Amino acid sequence: MLMERSSYKNLLPGLTYYVGLKIYLCPVETMDLFKGRCWADWIMGLGITHLGSGSRGNATLISTENCNVLVDCGFSLKQTENRLAIADVDPNSIDAVVVTHHHKDHSGSALRASKKWGASLHCNLGTAIRRGWRPIEECTTFGNLERLDFPGGMSMLTIPVPHDDSDNVGIIASDGRGSRAGIVTDLGEATRDLVKQLSGCNHISIEANYDHSRLLRGPYPDSLKRRISGRGGHLSNFQTGQILQEVSNKNLQSVVLCHLSESNNAPHIAESEVLLAMGDEFEGSVSISKQKGPEFTHWAGVEEPSKLAIV
């Protein structure tokens, strides 16, 4: 018997969401029925799987039944492949790697991964220059507010966001059939373009980097505190809550909070502050993407529970 995940919000902390679909839990022993099958073969929609998020590495798998795109590749190549294996995803099935900016925790093994897996590598020109990647030969560069098209109808829109000296972008992914997901980390504030695009999403993964009071009381030097909390730094729990309150709508089904600082934040603080800001009108789920991932405990299906996806 399948159970809707929304009724068991705190039972299992899995971090795979299927935009536009109902999410189900299923007994662990049932997994043997689907051993060796890619979970994307069983769904029609947009899958978002966080392989891990934080200052030591970031990677998010965006999938449809016909396409796998890795947004950021900040872990070592070995770690990334190990995390994909936990998700039962063959690295050679990755069609593309999209890098949001040049910082190592987002781009570290992207070039090696794209070459080994035969996946195309996409980034903006600023990222390519800072990483020393050769446009055309090694990567395809994109501009701001440019749509990237991938196999099977998946597309991604690149939204420029402010973060330190990097040319960072947020990603709005679409499956071409109405399901949309926003992936946004490493920014000091939300731009109007970003807010506009997030307002149409069914799923949002967004950073909630620090608790303001913890940052002020913490051991960081004042210069670093100012950088983190500045326009080009990171989003606080409060800022993230305000953004989600503004963009929340009846179609928003799930939120994942990412890139939490281990020194200046805590999962329960981030979750409670965001939920308080979003209010009772939001009926979806809020979860945390941890540094050590992925945590795969969810099954997802379409309208008929018999169409399952292994996670």
Whereabouts are the PLM-identified features?
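Conserved beta-strand hairpin/beta-sheet module of binuclear metal-dependent hydrolase folds
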Residues: 24, 33, 39-87, 168-186, ...
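Structured catalytic core of nucleotide-sugar glycosyltransferases
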Residues: 49-59, 102-110, 128, 158-159
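Active-site neighborhood of phospho(di)ester-bond hydrolases with catalytic His/Asp-centered motifs
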Residues: 71-74, 95-102, 123-125, 182-185, ...
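Active-site metal-binding motif and surrounding structural segment of the metallo-beta-lactamase
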Residues: 76-123
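Active-site environment of divalent metal-dependent phosphoester hydrolases
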Residues: 103-107, 129-130, 166, 190-192, ...
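Metallo-beta-lactamase
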Residues: 123-178
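Cap/insert and terminal regions of metallo-dependent hydrolase folds
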Residues: 192-290
